[in-house]
């Protein structure tokens, strides 16, 4: 779509697919048939050549309409490019005679925008269009894309420290993690609370949000835990002094 991606498509075939008229008055019937046959072969060859390029253009527009990112600045840039494509690039292609390219570009992007605008209207949050997704999680007013887990179960894990956690590109500070809650809105609707805070060996935490309480956390890296415990015992043994 940029830099001539749409210059070789089926719309060019439509412009080129005009009957070849021989203005000479004294043309035999056999020659006219040969001209028609040659014209048919030329148009068929052009159509076969432009089908793959048209398919690539359609796939590119579809990819652009569905592409999403978790980075805020990237999402802003992509959204601005989509708006320019719908309002400027699509009509420009139509004005220059590339009707199929312009119609496909404008229609696909507009339909995607209208679909996301429904969630924007229902939830009164523009982030559905910004992040190009139908489901968002809100942590104390801050929006971030929600990634579905396996088996369509709804839970969220956030990485952080003893008094903070990372929400996408933002850092949320808190006093008590039990006061932090997550609201899932869009295609899924759920309210999650902190059910477990897992402390890592380096001092960081992984906060687990779920609708169901967590019974326990299994330490799969038991060898690392055993080695760490041995190191602590050796340090304590080195600090033991004989006072007798």
Swiss-Prot record:
Domain of life: Viruses
Subcellular location per the Swiss-Prot or TrEMBL entry: Host membrane
Residue ranges annotated for the CoV 3a-like viroporin TM domain, each copy included: 41-131
Membrane topology of the entry: Multi-pass membrane protein
Residue stretches spanning the membrane: 47-67, 75-95, 102-122
Pfam families noted in UniProt: Corona_NS3b
GO cellular component: host cell membrane; membrane
InterPro entries in the record: a/bCoV_VIROPORIN_3A-like_CD (IPR046446), a/bCoV_VIROPORIN_3A-like_TM (IPR046445), Coronavirus_Orf3a/b (IPR004293)
Keywords: Host membrane, Membrane, Transmembrane, Transmembrane helix
Signal sequence residues: none
Family stated for the protein in its record: Belongs to the coronaviruses NS3b protein family.
Record-given protein name: Non-structural protein 3b
Organism: Porcine respiratory coronavirus (strain RM4)
């Amino acid at each position: 779509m940029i830099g001539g991606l749409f210059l070789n498509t089926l719309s060019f075939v439509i412009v080129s697919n005009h009957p070849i008229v021989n203005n000479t008055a004294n043309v035999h019937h056999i020659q006219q048939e040969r001209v028609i046959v040659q014209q048919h072969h030329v148009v068929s060859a052009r159509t076969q050549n432009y089908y793959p390029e048209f398919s690539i253009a359609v796939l590119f527009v579809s990819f652009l309409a569905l592409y999403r990112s978790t980075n805020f600045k990237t999402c802003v840039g992509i959204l601005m490019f989509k708006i320019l494509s719908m309002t400027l690039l699509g009509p420009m292609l139509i004005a220059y005679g590339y009707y199929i390219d312009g119609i496909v570009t404008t229609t696909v992007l507009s339909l995607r925008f209208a679909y996301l605008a429904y969630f924007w209207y229902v939830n009164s949050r523009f982030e559905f269009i910004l992040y190009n997704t139908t489901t968002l999680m809100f942590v104390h007013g801050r929006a971030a894309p929600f990634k579905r887990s396996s088996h369509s179960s709804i839970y969220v894990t956030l990485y952080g420290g003893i008094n903070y956690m990372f929400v996408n590109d933002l850092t949320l500070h808190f006093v008590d993690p039990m006061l932090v809650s997550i609201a899932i809105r869009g295609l899924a609707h759920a309210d999650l609370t902190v059910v477990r805070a897992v402390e890592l060996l380096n001092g960081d935490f992984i906060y687990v949000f779920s609708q169901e309480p967590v019974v326990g956390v299994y330490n799969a890296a038991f060898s690392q835990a055993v080695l760490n415990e041995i190191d602590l015992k050796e340090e304590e043994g080195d600090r033991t002094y004989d006072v007798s």
